[in-house]
UniProtKB/Swiss-Prot annotation:
Keyword Secreted: yes
One MF term in the entry's GO annotations: toxin activity
Protein name per the record: U1-poneritoxin-Ni1a
Expression across tissues: Expressed by the venom gland.
Disulfide links within the chain: none
Highest taxon of the lineage: Eukaryota
Cellular localization per UniProt: Secreted; Target cell membrane
Organism field: Neoponera inversa (Ant)
Organism lineage: Eukaryota, Metazoa, Ecdysozoa, Arthropoda, Hexapoda
Record's function text: Has activity against Gram-positive bacteria. Has insecticidal and hemolytic activities. May act by disrupting the integrity of the bacterial cell membrane.
Statement: the UniProt record of this protein carries the keyword Nucleotide-binding: no
Chain positions found as Lysine amide: 20
Length: 20
């Protein structure tokens, strides 16, 4: 579960870059 949460945390910045 912690690994999945960490993956989502690191994926958020990538998603933000996609929208910018």
């Amino acid at each position: 579960f912690i690994g999945a949460a960490l993956g989502a945390l690191t994926a958020i910045p990538s998603i933000i870059k996609l929208f910018k």
